[in-house]
From Swiss-Prot:
Name of the gene this protein is made from: ndhF
One annotated Gene Ontology cellular component of this protein: chloroplast
Membrane topology: Multi-pass membrane protein
Name listed for the protein in its UniProt record: NAD(P)H-quinone oxidoreductase subunit 5, chloroplastic
Species this protein is from: Arabidopsis thaliana (Mouse-ear cress)
Reactions catalysed according to its record: a plastoquinone + NADH + (n+1) H(+)(in) = a plastoquinol + NAD(+) + n H(+)(out); a plastoquinone + NADPH + (n+1) H(+)(in) = a plastoquinol + NADP(+) + n H(+)(out)
UniProt subunit comment: NDH is composed of at least 16 different subunits, 5 of which are encoded in the nucleus.
Length: 746
């Protein structure tokens, strides 16, 4: 075992050769490097698989032995200061390494097909390899300086991938926005690290926790300054994990390729903030005010993310706000001291959200040949609908991910979210009400995404102009009787998974639809069939095998990963696998907790949380399921139309919520008017002062000297006698001035 830990330092460096070789190859041998591009993909997956196997082996040892291993090397600067760097292996490191590698491998496999037609294919894989290296280095770091170094590398890789298509102004602006927002958090983190070193004199985690606790117990440090340093440490995770108010970069980060959106939201960028708070929790837990701030920021983010997701039209931005809300749950759990629940939800959410993002990428790929390659169209849920029969495997995978995120048993997120809701009830009734209400909102907006995407008809072909020039939007007809389509009778799961890419002429197949009378007069996007007056529509086709395979693996994770936190004791809920994994941390955070909970209490709490989720799903079905239009003609619903006053108030409330959500809570607008515009005005004034005043003085002296020289040259006429005359004149004037001042004194 000791032999295994001695080589743990190599974990971050195993995936590193690929980005280095790709960078050198593209600079020195671009043609040969591009011709071997599939080899680089295979090598990336192979090296990351080695790290995954190594991490699993370390995790098994952690479960049975529950030990912590640290190895450091000292780099002496002088007699007073020496910097130590090394690696730190504990349960948190092991489980984060497994999470990063498993999701990373699946995203790499997915990206091979998704990015196959992109000119930046190799650049993308170089960034991805460096991204995985940076994140693995972060989770294995033994001190705060190493953490900060890899923290910045993780941020740099995320900026490169968010702005991967940098020729698009929107992507470039999103990259800049992510960079500037995270600069605020990273600067706070740096100040917190320096302040903590000034107090304790150490960067090492174990020494830091011990010294910090002794200072608190013996009252040998200013508590206010200590709280300030701890808060500055927390500012970094606020920005990195998209917590309020530094969350504004996350929705715009969806301008990057979809595979990197899956990796950022599941296992790298946003998970880094949760990891750091979990790593520093023994430090935060001795300061109650900081714990309350962490939980408060978490609960605000939970509610804000859920409300902002309610009216999003972009499928990826809807999932992004969902990530923001779920990260708020994790931060809330950490603020309450529920270390196990937070990390459990981090694990379950990672696989569920990776599945949803990869599913959305499959949907976007299917829509691009119909609506074009503009993200405003291919990612717009309003133009989707009716994809169930066209992409059945993607639909099933997306549905499982949606149900998991809604908290439906026995899927993964049910077990972890239920624990957080129960802990919030013990922590604060107000926080519990908000957390439970948001669980219902989560079910609502997730099924809204699902229903708009897969149910009804393909809305691209049912787009109808409202008929009013002043209309601010196009009205959509979601209904229309569908008649028989030409389908491939041999279509099935096994042939789909075994076919080659060469067996498919394109990603899409041609299908002819007959339109019923109730939509006959609407305006359609049509393709003329070789001059014939026949309307032929192109419909999405299921994605290729290399896109579907990672999704199917993530489906298995979503179905079964919750088992690591499910208790199996017949008498009560005893410590499960995950609890054994985090035994040292549980003893630290819950010293007086009982080792089991009654099954009756568990079932009662689970029934309550599932009921909330089903209520949210029911509301979503009522509002977005296609058969809702027929219900409007029922007498029961028509009777509500008579209550005009109440209906008007209800519509005002709905419009307010819609505008709030669609405009991102007006937070971006507030930052733009109050902060960005002020900084721009200050920058313009500074530029004016620098160019007109500072440069004006300098340039004025130079220009004056130039003209004096020119005048002197003109008067002198290049004769020595003239120069002597001018020189004597200056001396005489100087003596007269001196003589005048001399007699003034007397």
């Amino acid at each position: 075992m000791e032999h295994t830990y001695q080589y743990s330092w190599i974990i971050p460096f195993i995936p590193l050769p690929v980005p280095i070789l790709l960078g050198v190859g593209l600079l020195l041998f671009p043609t040969a490097t591009k011709n071997l591009r599939r080899m680089w993909t295979f090598l990336s997956i192979f090296l990351l698989s080695i790290v995954m196997i190594f991490s699993i082996y370390l995790s098994i040892q952690q479960i049975f032995l529950s030990c912590i291993h640290q190895n450091v090397w000292s780099w002496t600067i002088n007699n007073e200061f020496s910097f130590e760097f090394g690696y730190f292996i504990d349960p948190l490191t092991s489980i984060m390494s497994i999470l990063i590698t498993t999701v990373g491998i699946l995203v790499l496999i997915y990206s091979d097909n998704y990015m196959s037609h992109d000119q930046g294919y190799l650049r993308f894989f170089a960034y991805m390899g460096f991204f995985n290296t940076s994140m693995l280095g972060l989770v294995t770091s033994s001190n705060l300086i190493q953490v900060y170094f890899f923290w910045e590398l993780v941020g740099m890789c995320s900026y490169l991938l968010i702005g991967f298509w940098f020729t698009r102004p929107i992507a470039a602006n999103a990259c800049q926005k992510a960079f500037v927002t995270n600069r605020v958090g990273d600067f706070g983190l740096l100040l917190g690290i320096l302040g903590l070193y000034w107090i304790t004199g150490s960067f090492e985690f174990q020494d830091l926790f011990e010294i910090f606790n002794n200072l608190i117990l013996n009252n040998r440090v200013n508590l206010l300054f200590l709280t300030l340093c701890a808060f500055l440490l927390f500012v970094g995770p606020i920005a990195k994990s998209a917590q309020f108010p530094l969350h504004v970069w996350l929705p715009d980060a969806m301008e990057g390729p979809t595979p990197i959106s899956a990796l950022i939201h599941a296992a790298t960028m946003v998970a880094a903030g949760i990891f750091l708070v979990a790593r520093l929790l023994p430090l935060f837990i001795v300061i109650p005010s900081i714990m309350y701030i962490i939980s408060l920021i978490g609960i605000i983010t939970v509610l804000l993310g859920a409300t902002l997701a309610l009216a999003q039209k972009d499928i990826k931005r809807g999932l992004a706000y969902s990530t923001m809300s779920q990260l708020g749950y994790m931060m809330l759990a950490l603020g309450m001291g529920s270390y196990r629940s937070a990390l459990f939800h981090l694990i379950t959410h990672a696989y569920s959200k990776a599945l949803l993002f990869l599913g959305s990428g499959s949907i976007i790929h299917s829509m691009e040949a119909i609506v074009g390659y503009s993200p405003d169209k291919s990612q717009n849920m309003i133009l989707m609908g009716g994809l169930t029969k066209h992409v059945p495997i993607t639909k099933t995978a997306f549905l499982i991910g949606t149900l998991s995120l809604c908290g439906i048993p026995p899927l993964a997120c049910f077990w972890s979210k239920d624990e957080i809701l129960n802990d919030s009830l013990l922590f604060s009734p107000i926080f519990a009400i908000i957390a439970c209400s948001t669980a219902g909102l989560t079910a609502f907006y997730m099924f809204r995404i699902y229903l708009l995407t897969f149910e009804g008809h393909l809305n691209t072909y049912f787009l109808n102009y409202s008929g009013k020039k002043s209309g601010s939007f196009y009205s959509l007809s979601l209904w229309g009787k569908e008649e028989e389509k030409k389908l491939n009778k041999n279509f099935g799961l096994v042939p789909l998974l075994t076919m080659n890419n060469t067996k498919r002429a394109s990603f899409f197949c041609n299908k002819t639809y007959k339109i019923s009378n109730n939509v006959r007069n609407q305006i359609f996007i049509t393709v003329e069939n070789f001059g014939l007056n026949t309307r032929t529509f192109y419909y999405p086709h299921e994605s290729d095998n290399t896109i579907l395979f990672p999704m199917l693996i993530l489906v298995l994770f979503t179905l079964f990963i919750g088992a690591i936190g499910i208790p199996f004791n017949q008498e009560g809920i005893d410590f499960d696998i995950l609890s054994k994994f985090f035994t040292p941390s549980i003893n630290l955070l819950h010293k007086n907790s009982q080792n089991f909970v009654d099954w009756y209490e568990f079932l009662r709490n689970a029934t309550f949380s599932v009921s909330i989720a089903f209520f949210g799903i029911f509301i979503a079905y009522c509002l977005y399921k296609p058969f809702y239009s027929s219900l409007l003609n029922l007498t029961l619903l028509n009777s509500f139309q008579k209550w005009n006053s109440k209906r008007i108030h209800w519509e005002k409330l709905i419009n307010f919520v819609y505008n709030w959500s669609y405009n991102r809570g007006y937070i971006d607008s507030f930052f733009k008017t109050s902060l960005i515009e002020s900084i721009r005005r200050l920058a313009k004034q500074t530029t004016f002062f620098d160019k007109r005043i500072i440069d004006g003085i300098t340039n004025g002296v130079g220009i004056t000297s130039f003209f004096v020289g020119e005048v002197t040259k003109y008067i002198g006429g290049s004769r020595i006698s003239s120069y002597l005359f001018l020189y004597l004149s200056y001396v005489l004037i100087f003596l007269m001035i001196l003589f005048f001042f001399y007699f003034e004194k007397f």
